[in-house]
C-alpha cells in the first residue's frame, strides 16, 4: 500500500496489470496496478543509465491539478492535487502535500488534467533520504549508489522537507543529467 497527496489517494497494489490499461511498459521492470482517488494507476520500476527509476502512470478519472516547479531544464518537482487550486495559494496548499521529481519535455508549470487524461512521470529519490545523506556525500557516484539501494517506499517526496543540503544535491544531480544528455 502507498499513500498519495492528503492521504486520500490510497492505492492497494497488485502485480497483475489489466490488459485494458493504456500506456507502454518499461522493459525488464515489475509493474504494479491499483485504484484510488485519481483513478487507475500503474507503478513500474527499472534502471535507466544505472539509476533506479519508478515510472508511474495515472489514468485520470477525476479533475486533477498539477503544479510543477522547475529545477533545471527538463527537470521539475511536481505536486499532484485533487481539484483546481490557484497558484497564488500554493505556499499554503502545498505545505503538507506529497511531491515528486519528474522529467517534463516542455516548460508547462500549471495545468489541469480532465477525466480520461493520462499522467506519466518518473520518481527518483526521497528528500528525506537526501537530508540524511547530504552531510556524508562527496561525489555524485556515492549518491547514485545510495539511490540504487533505496527501498521502494522511499521514493515519496514531501514538499516541506527540502533543506539547503538536499537542494544542493538535487542541483548537482540535475546538472550532471544535463551534461550527460
Report residues per predicted region.
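Alpha-helical bundle regulatory/interaction domains
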Residues: 88-181
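Glycine-centered secondary-structure boundary/capping sites
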Residues: 21-23, 83, 139
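Generic structural motif
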Residues: 58-63, 82-84, 126-130
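Short hydrophobic beta-strand segments that form the core of ligand-binding sensory/regulatory domains
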Residues: 55-57, 76-80, 120-126
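N-terminal low-complexity or simple alpha-helical regulatory segments
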Residues: 1-73
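Glycine- and acidic-residue-biased ligand/ion/polar-headgroup-sensing regions
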Residues: 71-90, 127
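General N-terminal targeting signals
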Residues: 20, 70-75, 140-142, 147
